[in-house]
């Protein structure tokens, strides 16, 4: 599978998860490859989807955070490369309440 198709499949997969979990019509930004923009927009969030065969280090970080947090707490990883800005990583299922709370009331 070429990388463009793999990326589009990942975007569709994330849209479907968000649609099911939030009950909100979430769609891919189809002009993003032409315009260089975000992949998905929902409320104030602009989402960039990355799908790779392996995300070895990031998954190791999350596994460590999950072990430390235990079942009663939310694991969050904050990381950065030297000279770069800090990044926050959490599981999509844990982020759903935050996204849901940010949606406009219908």
Model-derived segments and spans:
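Catalytic phosphate/metal-binding cores of nucleic-acid and nucleotide-processing enzymes, i.e., regions
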Residues: 1-106
């Amino acid at each position: 599978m070429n990388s463009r198709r793999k990326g589009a499949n990942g975007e569709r997969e994330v849209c479907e998860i968000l649609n099911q979990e939030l009950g909100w019509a979430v769609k891919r930004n189809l002009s993003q490859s032409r315009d260089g923009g975000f992949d998905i927009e929902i409320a104030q969030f602009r989402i960039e989807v990355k799908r790779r065969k392996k995300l070895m280090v990031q998954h190791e970080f999350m596994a460590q955070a999950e072990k430390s947090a235990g079942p009663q707490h939310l694991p969050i990883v904050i990381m950065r490369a030297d000279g770069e800005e800090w990044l926050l990583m959490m599981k999509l299922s844990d982020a759903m309440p935050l996204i849901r709370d940010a949606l406009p009331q219908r």
